[in-house]
Amino acid sequence: MNNIIPTEETHPLTWRLRNDRETVWIEEYCKKNGYFSLKKALKTMCPEDVVHLIKESGLKGRGGAGFSTGLKWSLMSKDNSSKIRYLLCNADEMEPGTYKDRFLMENIPHQLIEGMLLSAFALNVSRGYIFLRGEYIKAEYILKKSIQEAINFGFIGSNILNSGFNFELFLHTGAGRYICGEETALINSLEGRRANPRAKPPFPAVFGLWGKPTCVNNVETLSNVPSIVLHGVNWYKKLSKSTDTTGTKLMGFSGKVNNPGVWELPFGTTAREILEDYARGMKSGLFLKSWQPGGAGTDFLIEKHLDLPMDFTSIAKAGSRLGTAIAMAVDNKTNMISLVCNIEKFFSRESCGLCTPCREGLPWIVKILESLEKKEGHKNDVKNLERLCLDLSPGKTFCAHAPGAVEPLQSAIKYFRLEFEAGISIKKLKKCSNILGIQSNEFTSKV
């Protein structure tokens, strides 16, 4: 990566980065072809053209779900009787270990703003919000300044570039809840309500913010739109090495690697390339024990999966999810029970409490893991954990919080079951075996 010079043709998201890593403000952004796509769209395209272009490009959501962006846009209500529609940028990046959206907002904020302008034009939207994670203080300052710059240059406001297109953009900082990454919880929070997910249908495209048609897209997703509009579908598709997904993606590795970071790479780049060529391998004296492909809420994979292409289908076939594609390396000296317990504490604390399986199941999982960590577990603890994974699986709760929370647990048991079984207390096992009278059925045959 260090020997590769990013260009507009190969690195559409990051080629404008400064060598000193300072923010690219509007004057420099305009000198680097900034807002060219907006001018092209407003002068030569209609909104339907932009929607069709994005659909043909194959752009998929970069927040983790990987849903087709063009298809999502086409689901927006076609009823033009209501002139109020909203575009929301999901910048509530609270996935542990993930920092790609912050990277884009702090370094190239106008790329996101231009992407929102193009998306708003395509969707006939005149008002947008950036819902920003509250802890991103630096990004908040940069985005506020950048929005004002765009207003001063006439890119935000009324009759933009004499096209008749109007757009207002507001920045909203969240109060710090993981669940706000779920789009309907985000909408509730923006309305001033408790951030609980909503029942679907109706979907936000029909009944969203304040009951109006609303589209919610991720920061990185929106940041891809300007280059697609400027350079076209065929160029964008050829960027990828994958047959599954088009374009490039911000990918990275964290953990005890020599060079943790994030890089823009073509879809289809293998995890091994990212770990060894970009993150420069594990630190001295350590080797890779396991890894999560895209955030704390994705299943663990092991060393044999490193040669898989990083795209949505290949990682799913291996039993995990691409997620945010910011991977975490787990070294051989890390206790899997302690690691998973830490992850589950986070998800338990961040549960909104609306669904019983999630509200009660996650704290129960934490208690069992704490017991196993102290070597004080009961004989059936591992089986109970597996049963809880099923009870919190997709379809059992209102949103994807609980299913995501149990993904690291179920995969850790799958690959490192002996570590979990080693947490069962031998003393308790013997004590139970010696009880005469009332005792659990599991020990009856041994008495």
Curated annotation (Swiss-Prot):
Assembly information from the UniProt record: Composed of 13 different subunits. Subunits NuoCD, E, F, and G constitute the peripheral sector of the complex.
Listed EC numbers: 7.1.1.-
Binding site for [4Fe-4S] cluster: 352, 355, 358, 399
Gene3D superfamilies: 3.10.20.600, 6.10.250.1450, NADH-ubiquinone oxidoreductase 51kDa subunit, NADH-ubiquinone oxidoreductase 51kDa subunit, iron-sulphur binding domain
Top EC category: translocase
Keyword Metal-binding: yes
Residues given in the record as NAD(+) binding sites: 61-70
Cofactor: [4Fe-4S] cluster; FMN
Cofactor remark: Binds 1 [4Fe-4S] cluster.
Gene Ontology terms for molecular function: 4 iron, 4 sulfur cluster binding; FMN binding; metal ion binding; NAD binding; NADH dehydrogenase (ubiquinone) activity; quinone binding
Keywords: 4Fe-4S, Flavoprotein, FMN, Iron, Iron-sulfur, Metal-binding, NAD, Quinone, Translocase
SUPFAM superfamilies: Nqo1 FMN-binding domain-like, Nqo1 middle domain-like, Nqo1C-terminal domain-like
InterPro entries: NADH-UbQ_OxRdtase_51kDa_CS (IPR001949), NADH-UbQ_OxRdtase_suF (IPR011537), Nuo51_FMN-bd (IPR011538), Nuo51_FMN-bd_sf (IPR037225), Nuop51_4Fe4S-bd (IPR019575), Nuop51_4Fe4S-bd_sf (IPR037207)
Catalyzed reactions: a quinone + NADH + 5 H(+)(in) = a quinol + NAD(+) + 4 H(+)(out)
Family stated for the protein in its record: Belongs to the complex I 51 kDa subunit family.
Protein name: NADH-quinone oxidoreductase subunit F
Superkingdom of origin organism: Bacteria
Source organism of the structure: Buchnera aphidicola subsp. Schizaphis graminum (strain Sg)
Binding residue positions for FMN: 174-221
General function of this protein: NDH-1 shuttles electrons from NADH, via FMN and iron-sulfur (Fe-S) centers, to quinones in the respiratory chain. Couples the redox reaction to proton translocation (for every two electrons transferred, four hydrogen ions are translocated across the cytoplasmic membrane), and thus conserves the redox energy in a proton gradient.
